[in-house]
Amino acid sequence: MENEKTEKKKKDRTPKTWKTCEIIQQLEYMSAEDVESGLDHNAIKNYAYILHDKDVNDDGSPKAAHWHIYIRFKDSTPTDSICKWFGITSNYIGRIQGRFADALAYATHKNVSSKYQYLDEEVKSNFDFVKERDTARSREADKQRKAEIADLIINGVIREYNYTCLLYTSP
């Protein structure tokens, strides 16, 4: 009885519809053809996917080859539909942590330097994923720089008489 309640709670956490999602599935259970046919639906606005076949575990042993599939839908799309398209159960569909661009960065591990760095060319997408990823990363860098400058002003490092020297010098 307790186990049934726990199982029901887990199922209830899965959204009924998705605007964006990530699917992670081992190559052993999903072929490239399965991925492509799953993505061949009008409800999908943008997608990007990559096969991670060079990842390693903490102990250095190779991880099983697996797909990372990132999808942005035109409208909210039911979980059941996504499951049918890819031949998976709902537990393989996950929320994208952060923004869609963050997921795109993770596709090649651009945002995790300690992991194997995949080439941009290994990502298959129906849009310019590099441009979207890099634009978002540039915006984030701008925000961080503005915060850094604000801290320097607050702490008295940047003053009226020295701001040009500190802010406009070439690296």
What are these regions (language model features)?
Residues 74, 159-162:
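Residue-level recognition of strand-loop junctions within catalytic nucleotide-signaling folds
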Residues 74-146:
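DNA replication initiation modules
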Residues 168-171:
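Conserved small/polar residues in nucleotide/adenosyl-binding loops
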Residues 1-65, 72-77, 81:
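Signature for HUH/AEP ssDNA processing cores
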